[in-house]
Structure formats: C-alpha cells, structure tokens
Amino acid sequence: MKRQSVSEIREIFLNYFKDKAHAVVPSSSLLPAGDPTLLFTTAGMVQFKPLFTGAVELPYTRATSCQKCLRTTDLEVVGKTERHCTFFEMLGNFSFGDYFKEEAIDYALDCSVNHLGFDKEKIWVTVYTDDDEAEKIWITKGIPKERITRLGKKDNFWGPAGDSGACGPCSELYLDRGVEKGGPDCATSGTCRPGCDCDRFLEFWNIVFNQFNQDTEGNLHPLKQTGIDTGSGLERVALLLQGADSVYDTNELRKIISFYEELSGIKYDDVITLSKMPTQKNNTARIAANQKAAFRVVTDHIRSVLFSIGDGIYPDRTGRGYVIRRLIRRATLFGRKLNFKEPFLYKLVDKVVEIYKPRYPELGKNSAAIQKTILAEEELFLKTLELGLEKIETLVAKTKTSGKTIFSGADAFLLYGTYGFPAEMTEEIVAEQGLDFDKKGFQEELEKDRQLSRESWKANKVSLMTGQSVEKTEFLGYSSLSGKGNIIHLFNENKPAGALKEGQAGAIVLNKTPFYPEGGGQVGDTGFLRQGKNVFKVLDTQKENDVILHFGEVLSGEFSIAQELEAEVEAARRERLRFHHSGTHLLNGALRNLLGDHVLQKGSVVSPEYLRFDFSHPSALTSKEIRKIESWVNESIRKNYPVVTKELPIEDAKKIGAVATFGEKYGDRVRVVQMGDASVEFCGGTHVSHTGEIGYFFIKKESSPGAGNRRIEGVCGPAVIETFQNRFAELTESVQNLNLKIKSELDNEGSKILVNSNVPGPDEIREKLEKEGATAVTFFRDLSEEIASQIEESTSAFLKMKKSLESRDFENNASVIEKVFASSMDTGVGKIVSAIFDDKDPNSLKGLSDNLKVREKNLLVILGSKNADNASVVITCSSQLVSKGIHCGDLVRTVCEMLGGKGGGKPDMAQGGGKEKQNLESAISFAIQLAKQTLTGEKV
C-alpha cells in the first residue's frame, strides 16, 4: 500500500470525485444548521439532508466533501483503542437521484485500490442481510463471494443523522490486517470475518443506499428519489495506509503528540514501549499504559475543543456547550498523568492551528479567542478539581465505613457527571484504597444518561403545513405595507378548516402578503386582513416551508378559501422593526471591527421595543468597550450610508465579505444587505433605506447568556428617547424618595448628604436628542450614570449615618442600661453583667459597655449579639478586676470556640464571633461561671 500523508489522502479523494463530475463542497460547521435534532455535525451527509429528502431545489446531483465531525458516543474508550476519536474528518461522496448502487460500489473500489493504494486482495465487504443486488455487484467487480459477509440491521442499515431524515441499507469495505491482529481464538477458529469484535478487520468505507425517509416517529417512507451517502474516516484511512499502530500514530496526530512531549518532558515512544510489558504486578507498565491513554486523550480532545470553539460552540452548562466543557475537563484530568498541574491545553492552540489552517483558514482568525476561552475553562476546572478529589475521599471513606468493598457505580457516575472524573481514573484511585470498582453499575448509570442525551432534541412546535399541498407565498413587504391576496389555507385549533367565523382564532395563508414572518431574529408583523365588514386581526406572522401564516382572530364577519383580502401591516410598528434590524447589523459590524473576527452572531431578537444581540466573546465588555461600540454605531448612523439590498449567488456574496448568521442554512442564492463600509450581511429582513433614518443608538445592558457568549440589549430611534425618559423618571423618583427619607429620619444632620441633581424632564430629553443626535446619547448616558452614582453614594452615607445614630441611641439608652444592671451578679469582689441583643455590631456593644463601666468601678461586662449570619461578643472590665485575674481576651477565646469562630484581645477589652449563633447563650453563661471562679476562687 502507498504511504501517503493525511493531507495527500484528503486531496486524492476529493480530486478523484471531482474528476467524476462531483461538486466539491466545503465542510459545514460542527453546528448543524437548521437541524434541532443534532447536537453536532456527526457525518458528512448532515449538510445534505434537505437534498436527500427533496425539501429544497437541487444545486447539483453529485457532491463530495471532507466534513468536520464530532461524536461523543464512545467517549469513554477514546485513548484506549487504536481507532476511536471524538473529532474526525469524514470523506464522502453523495448522489441525489443521480447514480445508485452499481456506480457507488464501482467508485469505492476504484478509488480505494487504484488511487489510494489499498491491496484489493485484502479487501472484504459486508452487505445488508437481504441485499442480493449489492452482493452481485461486488462479485462482478472482482470481490469473491467468500470475502462478502451479510450482516443485520444493527451493522448494515444506516441512518438517519438525528431522529429524522434519509436512511437505508449499507455496504462496508474492510481491510484484512492479518490474523495477528485477531483475538485469541480467531487464528484457530477460521470463522473470523467482518463483524467480529477483534481488530483484524477494520472498516474504512461505508456506502449507504438511501431509499427511505424516517420521520420523527420512526416510520419509514420511500424517498421520491434514491441517493448515495458514503463515509470514509480520514484518520482511519491514514492509519491503514501509513501502517500505523493507531490513528494517533498517523502523521498529523503524532505531530500534536510531539507538542505534548515537549511540554511534559515525557517521551511518547518510551511510554508505548513500557506499556507493552506485562501489567500484572508491574507498576511501571501500569503507569505507562495510563500515560499512553493520556497522550491520546489530550491529543484528540484539543482538536474537538479547538474546532468547536472555532465554529462558535463555546463551553457552557447545557447542550452542546456542556459537551465541550466536559471534553476540556476530561483532557485536564488526563493531563495530570503527564505531570500537568497547571493549565496546559491553551498553550497548544497556536501550534495545532498551524497544522489545520491550510485546510480550515477560519481557525487562524479565531485562535486568540479560542486560546483565551480554553485557558478560562482550565482555570475554572482546576478549582473544581480539588473539590472533586476531596469528594472522592469522602465517598471512599463512606464506602469503607459501611463495610463495603465495592465502590458503587452511582458514586462513580456522580464524580463523572459533576466533577468530570473519567471512570478509569476513579477506578485507579479507589483501587489504591483497596476497593473494587462497580463497572456494571457505572455503565448502567452511564446508559441512563445516554438515553437522556442521545444527540437529539425534540421540536415541540406544531407543524400546520404537514400533509398540505404547498404553494409558496409571495412576499410583497419589502416595497409595500399593504396589498391584496387570496386565501389558500385556513386553520382553526391547529387543524385545516373550511372557514373562520367571528370570535374564532386561527391562521390564514394568502398567496401574496406584505406581512413579514418571524425570521432572522425579527418578530413577525401585526396588522389586519379585511374584506368589507370581514376583519381579521393579525397578532403574529410565521413562516413554514416558504408558506407565510397569519395568526390572529376574527373580529367580525367570516373568512373562507379563495376570498380576496386587503392585507395591511401596522406601519408604525414595522418602522421600529426596521430601525432595530438595521441597528443590529451596525452593532454586528461594530463588534467585529472593534473586538475581532472571532465574534459570531449566536442569536438575536429584533422587536419594536428593543434589539437583543448574542455573540461569541470570551469575556465581559468593559465600560470603555461599550462606549466605543455605541459610538461606532452612532457614527455609522451619522454617515447616512445607503442601505443596498441585492440577491447574489452565495459564492459571490462570500467574496464581497458578506457575514452569515451563525447556524442558518442558506440556498444557492442569498439576499445581501450592505450599509456602506459598516456592514455586509446575509439577511432576509426589513431595513431602512439609509442608516441616518435610525436616528441614534443606545446600549441599555451588557450581560452573559452563557459561558463564552455575551449579550447586548439596545434601542434605536424613538425607543432611545423613551428609554432615557423612563430612566430619568425613575432617577427623579429615586432622588425624591431618598431625599425625603434623609430629611425625615436624620433631620438637619442629613443635609450634607442630600442628592442635589437637576434631572432633565421628558421634553428636554426629546428636544436635545432630536437636535444633537448621538452627542446627546453620550451626554444622557454620562448624566444618568452620574446621578445613579450620587444616589448610591448618598444611600450608603444615609445608612451609615442612620446606623451611627441608632448605635449612639442604643449606647446611651437609659432603659437598656437599667435592664442590663437589673440582671447583674455580685461576686463580692466585683459585679458581672451580661446581655444578648439582636443585630448589634461590635462597636455598638463596646459603646454600651463603656457607658456601663462608668456606673460601676469593679465591673465585668459580657455582651453578645445574634446577627443574620453569625454571633458577635464583646467583653470588657475595669482595671481593678484585671488585677484580680480577669483576662477578657481569654474569656472571649473560650466563648468564640463554642461559637465555632475566633476572637481575642487585651486583659481589659476583647471581642470576637462565630457562625454557630445558637450556642451564644450557653457560651456566655459558661464565661460568667469562669469569671466568677477567677474572682472568688470557688469551683463551678
């Protein structure tokens, strides 16, 4: 066999199918566009699913690709086997109603043998159990019947990717690697063939004969046109062609391992040699086996994490992000076996990017953000890791205390799911403690978890158009807010209806409409559909399969199929939507210009009231950055760029730098919206004709919707005026309420902390914004922040002053002093007084103590307070009692020990506290007894 590099194999494959009239299609994102049933792109056919089912018009009938893929179903064996990876590249060729079984089989064999260099005499194939046709074709191509194996549905019926889509029987190509790769019994039994669990036969090419479409209920329906979907794992092909021991020993992955060798000081080849020694009672071999797995795990996981973050999938608490976080944590844990105690993964980003940048240039643009994100995750987990190690100690102790010798699978899964501990690491740790590991119990818990997260999400939205004859709705709304259209569908209670009557709610479909359906973040239009006295109020507009549905209720009259209606969009609302949608584009442009190309749109809401924009960015924006972004947008508004929309072939749109919305699926032709030099984006929404129409832009809030992402909420045009009017109205009310409280509770003493700010009124705000535009936005932002700061400072001063006055009143309160003395204890040498209060700080207790000592010369004062989260205690005494042996510091330490806290001080004054406030009474009582014993010599 020829020994080719990974990049050479990739190019040979793609060029072969290019010569066979296949369109070479670039890899899609790891985030499946428009497919909620998949967490990640798991196969080459994912981006082609609509083409197989006939849901979209075919741009080509033959295609080939090298697709980035991510699968975590075999995560626990990654690093242990020679072929499993979470991230891999899938080579594939596809036919959409063009060729079928014979050509697909011919291409696979020809490419494998005559171009990639596989030995035909070592190739075995499998076919579906009743696929006689495929078997006959293989035989005619020169594969003898004895090297053809029939397998059942589990092995040779593939698909769909997700819980719906194209699927069918398949045929796979295997390479016979020799009996030495087989299991103990394989060499002598003579029955070893594809399907055996040993490593002798390795599958390297799968041909799926797509004949069915599986719906979300699992039902199979014949496809209108058959198709071919093939998959050939690039890493696995390289393993075979390079004669490597594992995919990790192929040229690209071995290069990544060399980076880890350099960082760790451990040689991978030495580890491999030692790991092959007998492991029984051989600690060196056992350590080496663990280090071999560690090298492979961190090598695999850095690719998965790097490519995922590069595609905008950031670590998070749920969904896709959780998988990425888990991979980082798993790699961090395995890194400890290579002596990595500090963050290390992030250090490899630039080097790994260099390997893959020629094929995936987008990685180079995002490398800084990827590195920053990984570092933050590593630092976060290292804090969690110590907690996890403490937890495992607790669980081991619990197991031993209960008399058990087996560490439970449930406890192991707790460590796996909560702290990211791989089962093998837990097994190793508990073995050192003399415990067996419940593998079966762990697997049962793991399987339960898999069933809950099987890489698919169910969509709950009711599909009104299922089973309906589809006639696309012509959208008139780019140029007009009104127009005529005929009713072609009616729905009532989510079911087709012949008519809608007064008082009924439902949906109306017209053949033409000016109503914009929700899409691209922009909410659907509202308005009215009319015919004479028949009036339908549109409350929302949605789109399904190019059909626009008007949801609402019949206010009067009746509606039936074929009626011609006058459609009228609510103009004022649409205008605000235009302001906010165009503002969103300018905001996106500002973020990419000021923060970097790693910024990807992760979601948006365009409503009449505000805009919300989610984007990938690893850290919170500073106040300075927020102001720069806001100013950049306002400057683009001031320049009054013309807003130009045009339809272009998608490749032409990409050439002019048009920015795609993350996760969206596009056809061959796209609508592009350009705003001068500020923004060029794919977009189907409604916009202003010139940016100057927007007026002004203001950022209300910046926050995080999840790890690795940021969110900006902003307003444009009239909404800016309303925002500042509301904000200053709230500030006015806050100032008035605070000043009133200061005057009423502090009298003249509070005059210095009153808020003296001239808050602008509604008319003043409107006039200044309309006159000065963006300059006024900055002015009102600064003024509102200044007034808010004054309110905060005055509130703090008020509370401090109020507390001081309350403390002074408390310390000098005659009735409090009398009450304390009423419970005094006379020892004959001096008096002891004590009391417990609620919510008093140590200074107040000390002040009261000083006033008590003024009344008595020989006095010991023990005061305590129960506060919200703790208890505090102050003990003071006169100098005469110090000479009698009293030491307040010693007494406080005794009390605080009973409170679970600390304290101390001088002989005549000490203070402290603790969390266990429920013990305050008994602690003070004990201190009194100790003091009495010291003063009288009597034992207590």
UniProtKB/Swiss-Prot annotation:
Cofactor(s) in the UniProt record: Zn(2+)
Pfam families with a match to the protein in the record: DHHA1 (PF02272), tRNA-synt_2c (PF01411), tRNA_SAD (PF07973)
Gene Ontology cellular-component annotations: cytosol
Disulphides: none
Catalytic activity: tRNA(Ala) + L-alanine + ATP = L-alanyl-tRNA(Ala) + AMP + diphosphate
GO BP: alanyl-tRNA aminoacylation
PANTHER family in the record: ALANINE--TRNA LIGASE, CYTOPLASMIC, ALANYL-TRNA SYNTHETASE
Protein's name in the database: Alanine--tRNA ligase
Organism: Leptospira borgpetersenii serovar Hardjo-bovis (strain JB197)
